[in-house]
Swiss-Prot record:
GO terms for molecular function: cis-regulatory region sequence-specific DNA binding; DNA-binding transcription factor activity; DNA-binding transcription factor activity, RNA polymerase II-specific; protein dimerization activity. The lineage of its organism: Eukaryota, Viridiplantae, Streptophyta, Embryophyta, Tracheophyta. The gene is AGL86. This is Agamous-like MADS-box protein AGL86. SUPFAM superfamilies: SRF-like (SSF55455). Signal peptide: none annotated.
Length: 339
C-alpha cells in the first residue's frame, strides 16, 4: 500500500526533477482523457526552470480555451477558481468544523454522565464549577423536553400505554387448587375440565362469548388423568376390499395389559365406573380367568404385509371373539363372556 505523500517541497533536486517529469506526464494524460470522454475544452500551460514551457494541447487550443473563459461573466469566472491559498483556507475551515463537532459530543457525554451521577447521589465525587452546573441545568431541561416530545408523539399516534389491554391475571398454583377451581376447557361438551387456576379464579375463555368451549375431541364421558382408554379399530364390512392398512399397532397390549395395569395401581378409586359390578369383577379376577373376548381380538396380517392387505369383513366377532382367519380352514371357538 502506498504511503500518503507529504505536500511540501522536495529538498533533493534530483528527486524533485524526477517527480516533475512524472507528474507532468500524468497531468497531460488526465487532460486528454477528460476532453475525449466528456467532450469539454481544456488546456494546460506548465512552466518550469528545467525546460521550456509546456503547452497542451497546442498554442491554438490554449488560445481558444482562454477566449471561451474570458467571455464568461466575472462572477462565474471566480466562482470555482481555486488557488493554493484558497485551497489551504478551505481545508482549515473544514478541520475547524470537525473539531468543534467533536468537542460538542464530548461535552454532551460528560453532562450526561453528570446527570446520571446526580440521580445516583454521586455528585460529591466530582468537583463542579459554576459553568458545569449551568450547563448541567440546560442539558437536563433539554433532556426533559425530548422526553415530553416523545410522549406527545406516542399519545397522538394512539400508542400510549393506556391503550393496551390489561394483563391477564391467572394463578397457576394456590392453596385451594383442585376443588372449586375454574376449568380450562379443552374438550367437547360433557368432557371433564382441566383445572389450571386457583379456587374461585375465572376460567380462561378460548371460544367466543356465549359459544361452546373449544372442542379438541368429541363429546364423551369424563376421563381421569393418566388413563388409557381402549382403542377399538374401526373395520367397515361394506368396503372391506378397498381398505389399506398401514404400520401395525399392538391393540392387544393397549386393550388388555394397559387398562388392567392402571386398574391394579388404583387404590383410591380415582378411575371412572369403579362401582360397576363388571369392573369390580375384572379387578377381582385376572383377565386370564375370565372369558374376555379382547384377549383373542387381534388383527391378523398376511405374511407381514402391513400396507396392501385387504381385511375381510368381521362377521361374528361379538359371538365368537375371533377375527376371521386367512387360512383355508377356519376353526370357530365360542367363548363365554361374563357380564
Amino acid at each position: 500500500m502506498r504511503s500518503k505523500i507529504k505536500l511540501s517541497l522536495i529538498a533533493n533536486k534530483t528527486s524533485r526533477r524526477t517527480t516533475f517529469r512524472k507528474r507532468k506526464g500524468g497531468i497531460t494524460n488526465k487532460l486528454h482523457e477528460l476532453t475525449t470522454l466528456c467532450g469539454v475544452k481544456a488546456c494546460a500551460v506548465i512552466s518550469s526552470p528545467y525546460e521550456n514551457p509546456v503547452v497542451w494541447p497546442s498554442t491554438e487550443g490554449v488560445q481558444e480555451a482562454v477566449s471561451m473563459f474570458m467571455e464568461r461573466p466575472a462572477t462565474e469566472q471566480s466562482k470555482l477558481m481555486m488557488s493554493h491559498e484558497t485551497y489551504l483556507q478551505d481545508k482549515i475551515t473544514k478541520e475547524t468544523k470537525k473539531l468543534e463537532s467533536l468537542r460538542r459530543e464530548n461535552r454532551e457525554s460528560q453532562l450526561r454522565q453528570f446527570m446520571f451521577d446526580c440521580v445516583e447521589g454521586k455528585m460529591s465525587e466530582h468537583q463542579y464549577g459554576a459553568r458545569d452546573l449551568q450547563d448541567l441545568s440546560l442539558y437536563i431541561d433539554h433532556y426533559i423536553n425530548q422526553l415530553n416530545s416523545s410522549v406527545m408523539l406516542l399519545t397522538n399516534n394512539g400508542a400510549s400505554s393506556s391503550s393496551f389491554p390489561p394483563p391477564l391475571h391467572t394463578s397457576v398454583a394456590g392453596a385451594g387448587a383442585g376443588a372449586g377451581a375454574a376449568p380450562l376447557v379443552v374438550a367437547g361438551a360433557g368432557a371433564a375440565p382441566l383445572a389450571v387456576a386457583g379456587a374461585g379464579a375465572s376460567p380462561l375463555a378460548v371460544a367466543g362469548v356465549g359459544a361452546a368451549p373449544l372442542a379438541v375431541a368429541g363429546a364423551g364421558p369424563p376421563m381421569a388423568q393418566n388413563q388409557y382408554e381402549p382403542i377399538q379399530p374401526y373395520i367397515p364390512t361394506a368396503f372391506s376390499d378397498n381398505i389399506q392398512y398401514q404400520a401395525p399397532v399392538d391393540f392387544n397390549h393397549q386393550i388388555q395389559h394397559g387398562i388392567y395395569d392402571n386398574l391394579s395401581l388404583d387404590p383410591n378409586h380415582q378411575y371412572p365406573f369403579q362401582d360397576d359390578p363388571f369392573m369390580e369383577m375384572l379387578m377381582e379376577y385376572p383377565y386370564e380367568q375370565v372369558g374376555y373376548a379382547a384377549e383373542h381380538a387381534h388383527i391378523p396380517f398376511m405374511n407381514g404385509n402391513y400396507y396392501n392387505y385387504h381385511q375381510p369383513p368381521t362377521v361374528g366377532l361379538t359371538t365368537t371373539g375371533h377375527m376371521p382367519s386367512n387360512n383355508a380352514t377356519t376353526t370357530t371357538t365360542t367363548n363365554t363372556t361374563v357380564v
